[in-house]
């Protein structure tokens, strides 16, 4: 087996232990790449904070607006990975260049609504009665970041879908790690005028992020096109309109799912804010901790997408079923261990964010530690649902999972959390139990759907 874990023939499906090893090998560089992206976001936040709360508020809100928009649109490009995996499994690698170039054109087209949305951030904020000065500064920030939209859709959206499917996930790893250093140097230099760079204040962070995103995209394109080992996957090929329709058909429900999940957490954060500064601070700490741990099952879900898709393409639904359920097991196992850490050492974790011995922090520390206990449960089902969603994408099954996610998050999760918070008197804890309930319902629906779909494929005459 190659480093990609995708070169076995359909006649020789792997054992369960080999499934686990290959999935972990594929997921590891993806997880580190995603953690590197989080590290860049943390760097931006810390350096913006050095300019004061106004700069931090404007830059942070502008960056969040940018990343929500491009992340949702990147969901459409997730279809590239399963299409490539299917083609490779079916020994139809001649289709891969067509998928790549069609995905490349799709990235360019998706950048258009991203640029439009980012250009409208100031009037949108004014429409929601945000302070005019804040709206103006956010508009200036996103006015720069809009030039990074295409780079992000290519360098993150397309490449993160394409490279793992051809066995080149490690390219993402090294480029992402390098991006941390480049981003930090450019951020500091452009914010404060260091290293001979112009002093741009808080807008320097937007310029630095834009440059880093484009450097990342160019580096990945160079590594992909410049290596003989992978060049045949991206040889000149004409994008195909029917293939464009196929990619959009698989990908748009994923984008909606990303949007539904993003709005759930956004609405929860806004609702926690009603409960006061202490509750909001505790919520942000717990959510940040959970977000770091989430990068691992997210990567496992991406690996499941590729591996399930490969074995479906190879005509072996039994191996595809095993690949999916082994990935689910890995995701649940990791998040269970992560949850155990949260239960055993909540105050030590909160101490990374706040001074535990400061009496002014006592209420926030207590609530944050309590939320981490809920997060221990929350994480397990969150990992299960994201891996299950990835496995279903490998089956090209995205529309029913989209409906399941919408129902689970907004039909169960938010209403339950709201009732527990304001009618049962649980406050922020109630909202977090609501999140856990919503994620648990989606996790069960995803796993059950994968079971039904693979059972049907196995039973079907071939």
Curated annotation (Swiss-Prot):
Keywords: Antibiotic resistance, Antiport, Cell inner membrane, Cell membrane, Ion transport, Membrane, Sodium, Sodium transport, Transmembrane, Transmembrane helix, Transport. CDD domains: MATE_NorM_like. The chain crosses the membrane at residues 56-76, 99-119, 147-167, 172-192, 202-222, 247-267, 280-300, 325-345, 361-381, 402-422, 430-450. GO terms for biological process: response to antibiotic; sodium ion transport. One of its GO terms (molecular function) is antiporter activity. One of its GO terms (cellular component) is plasma membrane. It is a multi-pass membrane protein. It comes from the Bacteria. The keyword Transmembrane helix applies. Pfam families: MatE. It is found in: Cell inner membrane. InterPro entries: MATE_fam (IPR002528), MATE_MdtK (IPR050222), MdtK-like (IPR048279). The keyword Transmembrane helix applies. Its main location: membrane. Multidrug efflux pump. Confers probably resistance to the cationic peptide polymyxin B (PMB). Belongs to the multi antimicrobial extrusion (MATE) (TC 2.A.66.1) family. This is Multidrug resistance protein NorM. It comes from Burkholderia vietnamiensis. The gene is norM.
């Amino acid at each position: 087996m190659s480093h990609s874990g995708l070169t076995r023939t359909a006649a020789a499906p792997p054992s369960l232990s080999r499934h686990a090893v290959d999935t972990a090998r594929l997921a590891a560089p993806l997880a580190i790449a995603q953690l590197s992206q989080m590290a860049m976001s943390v760097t931006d936040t810390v350096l913006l904070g050095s300019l004061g709360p106004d700069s931090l508020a404007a830059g942070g809100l502008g960056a969040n607006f940018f990343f929500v928009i491009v992340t949702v649109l990147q969901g459409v490009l997730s279809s590239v990975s399963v299409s490539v995996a299917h083609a490779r499994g079916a020994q139809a690698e001649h289709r891969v260049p067509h998928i790549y170039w069609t995905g490349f054109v799709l990235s360019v087209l998706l950048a258009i609504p991203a640029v439009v949305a980012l250009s409208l951030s100031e009037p949108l904020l004014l429409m929601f009665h945000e302070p005019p000065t804040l709206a103006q500064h956010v508009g200036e920030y996103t006015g720069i970041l809009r030039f990074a939209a295409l780079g992000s859709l290519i360098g993150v959206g397309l490449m993160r879908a394409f490279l793992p499917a051809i066995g080149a996930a490690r390219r993402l790893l090294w480029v992402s790690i390098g991006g941390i250093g480049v981003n930090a140097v450019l951020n500091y230099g452009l914010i404060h005028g260091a290293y001979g760079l112009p002093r741009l204040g808080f807008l320097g962070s937007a310029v630095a992020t834009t440059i880093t995103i484009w450097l990342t995209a160019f580096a990945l394109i160079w590594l992909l096109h410049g290596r003989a080992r992978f060049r045949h996957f991206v040889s000149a090929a004409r994008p195909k309109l029917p293939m464009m329709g196929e990619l959009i058909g698989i990908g748009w429900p994923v984008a909606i799912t990303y949007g539904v999940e993003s709005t759930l957490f956004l609405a929860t954060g806004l609702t926690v804010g009603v409960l006061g500064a202490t509750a909001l601070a505790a919520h942000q700490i717990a959510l940040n901790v959970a977000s770091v741990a989430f990068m691992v099952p997210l990567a496992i879900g991406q690996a499941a997408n590729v591996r399930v898709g490969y074995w479906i393409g190879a005509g072996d639904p039994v191996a595809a079923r095993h690949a999916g359920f082994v990935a689910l097991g890995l995701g649940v196992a990791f998040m269970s261990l992560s949850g155990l850490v949260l239960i055993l050492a909540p105050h030590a974790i909160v101490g990374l964010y706040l001074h535990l011995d400061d009496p002014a922090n006592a209420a926030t520390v207590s609530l944050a530690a309590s939320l981490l206990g809920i997060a221990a449960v929350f994480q397990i089902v969150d990992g299960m649902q994201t891996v299950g969603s990835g496995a279903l994408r490998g089956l090209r099954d995205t529309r029913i999972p989209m409906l399941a996610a919408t129902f689970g998050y907004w039909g169960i999760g938010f209403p339950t959390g709201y009732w527990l918070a304001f009618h049962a008197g649980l406050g922020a804890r109630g909202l977090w139990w609501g999140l856990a309930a919503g994620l648990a319902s989606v996790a069960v629906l995803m796993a059950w759907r994968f079971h039904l779909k693979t059972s049907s494929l196995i039973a079907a005459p071939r």
